[in-house]
Amino acid sequence: WGCQREGCLRGKWGYHDVGAAGVVHMIGGFFALAVVINLGARIGRFNPDGSANAIVGHSMPMSVVGLMLIIVGFFGFLGGCIIYSSGAQWINIYGQPTTLSAFAFNTLMGFAGGLIGAYLTSREPYWMMSGGLVGIISVAPGLDLYHPGLAYLIGMGVAAVAPLVNNLLLKFRLDDAVGAFAVHGFGGFAGLVISGIFLSGYPNMNGMAEISFMGQLGGAVVMASLGFIPGYAVSWALKKAGVLRVPAHAEERGLDLTEVPAQAYPEWSGIYGEPVKAKPVMIAESKAAV
């Protein structure tokens, strides 16, 4: 519907999403939101008064490196959204002329703006790097048409709001462990709506409807529905079958110990996962050993 030049959203509404902010990210983000609703929060995530406790990952440097690898992959993913035709011309997925440099540089500008925007509102390294993803996703619909400066500002603005969206989910006791909805769902939705503002009136090829705000907004609603409705139905069915989440004891010990079983860090844990108490070394003993 939205990825091909003959798609109904493209032909009738002028839907423009060359970087798949809706077709990929919104569908995945809203699917994740639906699953989170049925899955419920992790043990210990919320207090009786509704306040949230932080459950952080085991290594912030590893998390940041992982996010950087995802961002590097985005340049390949988005670069794959354009085609080099036999006539020595780059075209986007809709058959319109574009350039590889436009995609690459606007991706970089969205990433840079996203880093700054998310850091300004969160002051957290994890959300700063996640903001880079939000920035790229938010400019994805118009990578072929945006000015680089505009791409930077869009990425910064949307990424600044993303941590606040995740905090809003916590108010409703929705535990999105990695911020999938705030990054992909909200980032894709905001990107499509904003592209409808700045790209409204741009013509399409072969007599198709021109890009419009209502077309982009309508396309965003369609993509949200295509993600949320199946996600809710599938997760609800799995919940009723009793297989949506692991038992409480497995959640507390970790799946590495209960399912594999294997220990990620055996040097720091006993055979049943209890922390090993380190033997204190006296200064005199350490000197004697030397």
Describe these PLM feature segments.
Residues 1-290:
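Hydrophobic alpha-helical transmembrane bundles of multi-pass membrane proteins
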